[in-house]
Regions:
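Structural recognition of the beta-strand scaffold that forms the well-ordered cores
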Residues: 43-49, 77-79, 100-104, 138-141
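Short helix-initiation/N-cap motifs at beta->coil->alpha
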Residues: 81-90
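Extracellular/periplasmic catalytic domains that process cell-envelope and extracellular macromolecules
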Residues: 38-41, 94-96, 130-134
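Basic- and aromatic-lined ligand-binding clefts that recognize polyanionic substrates
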Residues: 14-72
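Proline-aspartate-enriched helix->loop->beta-strand connector
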Residues: 90-103
Length: 168
């Protein structure tokens, strides 16, 4: 799309700058992650979307962060256990032994969305026993970079994601 727009405006330099250069940055980040010493179990994640009135598991497709995680080579348990998409099963989450849990908020009230997540954790104390939670790998991500398309900040989004995924 950017290629077409820059054809119309006659500004191919912007396609190079805002399209190809950003793609090259992202490809470099993805290659670094692929080459990192990451075990298969460390690629296992769960993506949650939190709003003021709910917290739901999300699959890899149809969400910005889900597609980015898939693009990086992560394994989202909600993709293979689709019952999680309908009913957030604490037992299924514990059984999967996740390495990371990513949460992205939605809606205008981010604090209310975070409270929904806190309530989920309080109502299900078994979630606190997850290694991902105990070891600080429950990541609440910036919705402007990971729920909405980050536009000119795609490379920054991938860099932040890379940093979270490679934290030990």
């Amino acid at each position: 799309m950017l290629d077409i727009c820059t054809d119309i405006t006659g500004r191919k330099d912007l396609y190079e700058q805002n399209g190809l250069a950003v793609k090259a940055q992202i490809d470099k980040i993805k290659a670094q992650y692929a080459e990192a010493d990451i075990q298969d179990g460390e690629r296992k994640i769960l993506l949650l979307r939190a709003a003021s009135s709910f917290v739901k598991a999300k699959g890899s497709s149809g969400t910005v962060l889900g597609e980015m995680l898939c693009d990086m080579g992560c394994i989202n348990i909600a993709d293979s256990n689709t019952s999680l998409l309908e009913n957030l099963s604490v037992e299924a989450i514990i059984w999967e032994e996740l390495y990371h849990i990513f949460v992205v908020t939605m809606g205008s009230d981010t604090e209310a969305a975070k409270r929904s997540l806190e309530n989920l954790m309080k109502e299900n104390p078994a979630l606190s026993t997850l290694d991902a939670v105990k070891n600080g790998r429950l990541h609440v991500m910036d919705k402007t970079l990971f729920n909405l398309k980050p536009n000119d900040r795609w490379a920054e989004s991938y860099e932040i994601l890379y940093e979270k995924l490679t934290e030990k």
